Amino acid sequence: MSTSHATPRILVIDADLDAIETARFALWRSHTACRFEWFDDAEVANASLLTQALCRSRDLPALILLDPRKFPGTEGYELLRTLCVYQQLAHIPLVLFTESPLCSDFAQEQDSRIWYAAKPALAADHMDLVTRCVQKRLRQPEFH
C-alpha cells in the first residue's frame, strides 16, 4: 500500500475559500497526519465523488466536512444526497456545518456518521472545531 493511501484523506467542500484555507491551516498547524483536499464547487465535488464511487475507488475520503448552504440553488444538498444514497459513499463520516439554532454543536460524545456543527464566525474558533472533528475521527478504531 502506498503512503498516500495510508494517510487519511480529509475532504472539505465549501463555497467559502476563506473557510477552506482556515481548515487547511488548522490541520497543518495541529500536525494532523492527513491529506487535505478541497472543492469550492459542489457540482464538481459531486461528479468527482460519484465517479470514484462508480469506479469503486479504494481512495475515498476518511472524512468529509461540508457546508451545503452557500452553494447556488440546491447544489450542496444534491451533493449531500449523493453521499447518502450511493452505497460506496454512504459509510464516509460527514461533518455538516449549519447556522440553525436547532442543530447540535459538535460534541465529543457524538458517534453517529453525520455530525452537525454550527460554523463559528471567528477563524480561531473554526480552526479549533475543524481540528477537534478531524482528530476525533482519526482516533476511531477503523483508522488504526
Summary of predicted features, one role per range:
Residues L94-F97:
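Hydrophobic/aromatic residues positioned on beta-strands within the core alpha/beta folds
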Residues A107-A118:
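As written
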Residues M1-L11, A15-T32, C55-L60, W115, ...:
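Non-catalytic signal-transmission and effector/linker regions of two-component phosphorelay proteins
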Residues H31-F36, D40, A90:
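A generic structural motif
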